[in-house]
Amino acid sequence: MEVYCHFKVDTGMGRIGFSVRSDFEAAIAAMERCAALPKLHFSGIFQHFAVADSTTPENEAYTQAQHALFERTVQRLQADGVALHTIHCANSAAQMRHPEWHHSLTRAGIILYGLDPSPEVHFDGLRPTMTLKSVVEFVKDLLPGESVSYGRTYTANTPRKVATVCVGYADGYPRALSGSNGNPNAGVMSIRGKPAPIIGRVCMDQTLVDVTDIPDVKMNDEVTVFGPENAAIGADTADSIAAKTGTINYEIICGISRRVPRVYLRDGAPVRIWNDLEET
């Protein structure tokens, strides 16, 4: 069997690859031995930046050093007769901040979702593309003194109207967004264009929200769990959820589980629906 592949070099990420930063000559020799194997066909080379999404002087210097070492590696292999047709190193942050490093191709990640790579790196013109939606499955009145969900972390002080939404941590919605009395980091969804704050703990398949101030909420109403600010009035965004839960926006969008159907839109109209439960 013949295998077509690219070299992966470690210039400072410290994850995988030929470690050109530890012993340059040994790494070059190892790659050239691999390139001589008859069943392996190396047509490209790549590396990954560790801190391209940081603008501090120290981290910018580290990123520059990574790229310089990568170029040195490429030039040496080419000088030794190794044909490298595809050269790539730029992730989302490097792609936007250093267009001179695009080489043969770039590896866009978070910017495909229209999100910034980090809080300190902002690109004008990006528009968030992903919205997580669900529906109301139950509406009820909550009397003063009554509690909801596991742990009884929320108890009504006044009469409230509560909606149960079909989404939970098994869908990738963080349990850390659970609402208790006075929790400032509770999640917020949007129903009928108005904010619906979470009350009680997020369950595996369901989450409860306060809809007291939203008139006429009923079963099967559409719920925006999170999405772009202009499309989800009052609801969390991927960035705000990341801030509330102490993580990054990457984890929020990548964490949506396989059981959530994906609806792909073009000009606002669905062009494909992918449902893993039906596909398998």
Indicate residue ranges for each PLM-predicted region.
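Active-site loop/helix belt of alpha/beta enzymes
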Residues: 1-4, 11-143, 215, 273
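Short, flexible coil/linker segments at or flanking structured domains
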Residues: 6, 30-33, 94, 100-101, ...
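Generic hydrophobic/packing signal
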Residues: 9-11, 256
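C-terminal accessory subdomain/extension
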Residues: 143-280
